[in-house]
């Protein structure tokens, strides 16, 4: 990233803090509704941000939306809230932690699968035991046999990088970690 871009980013961040924008709106709540609505839309949910607000704040389900869609949104909210607790504790990443988060995401919408390689249950956070593609004839994702080792490697590298960044006030490096 170029020096002028870094300086501009830091200037905008300082202006944001000095204006007190974070205190003017409930940013965490706004972010939560937006994140969940858009993330579940990728998976086919048609629940809107307003409908999620009613569901999360008041327990009012959306008319005309399937139970599965609404459970998908509630499950993702639970996983998000749990991940924020882990972040506040600075918990290390581990394969088991990621599987537990996956179980929360898929709690009410995940299924059990029986494959020639064995059975697994997405609602329990089990790692898949089959190949995955993006649509029929689409791009293939990593071979399922490589996933456990690659997840462990990801966790180790992320934990090492986080430890390095906890000892610095370099906002740019902390920001860039979210894209690594």
What are these regions (language model features)?
Residues 1-180:
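FIC/Doc superfamily catalytic core
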């Amino acid at each position: 990233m170029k020096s002028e871009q870094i300086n501009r980013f830091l200037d905008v961040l300082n202006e944001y803090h000095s204006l007190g924008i974070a205190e003017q709106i409930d940013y965490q709540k706004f972010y939560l509704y937006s994140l969940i609505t858009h993330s579940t839309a990728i998976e086919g949910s048609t629940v809107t941000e307003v409908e999620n607000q009613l569901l999360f704040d008041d327990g009012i389900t959306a008319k005309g939306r399937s139970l599965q869609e609404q459970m998908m949104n509630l499950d993702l909210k639970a996983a998000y809230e749990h991940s924020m607790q882990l972040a506040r504790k600075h918990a290390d990443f581990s394969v088991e932690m990621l599987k537990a988060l996956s179980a929360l995401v898929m709690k009410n919408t995940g299924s059990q699968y029986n494959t020639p390689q064995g059975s697994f249950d997405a609602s329990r956070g089990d790692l898949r035991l089959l190949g995955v593609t993006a649509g029929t004839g689409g791009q293939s994702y990593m071979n399922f046999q490589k996933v456990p080792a690659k997840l462990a490697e990801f966790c180790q590298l992320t934990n090492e990088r986080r430890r390095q960044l906890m000892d610095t006030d370099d906002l740019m490096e902390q920001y860039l970690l979210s894209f690594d």
